[in-house]
Amino acid sequence: MLYFDNAATTLQKPEEVAQAVKESFSYIGNAGRGANEASLFTSRLIFQTRKQIAELFHMEDGEQSSAAERVVFTMNATESLNIVLKGLLHPGDHVITTGMEHNSVLRPLS
């Protein structure tokens, strides 16, 4: 799992972030929600981003899916941690952690 969101601790944003936010208001479309141009544009943009992330981390295509199809976006780190912890762990599994862990790790483990 990779945590790309440092917005809570970073005051200044790169100019590219401001530009991307500005552009997002011009291309309003829900990916996968239709065949209209706005929806298709957004779908392509998301898939292109998945491809770039897969390439960045040298992910290889699997037998049944491309590397880009295995890149998953979540709303935040808490959701990502819940998916991993609740999806991989089973009752009786042993997990080593410390009291320094964030609440979003400790709660699913308790």
Identify the meaning behind each predicted range.
Residues M1-S110:
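Pyridoxal 5′-phosphate
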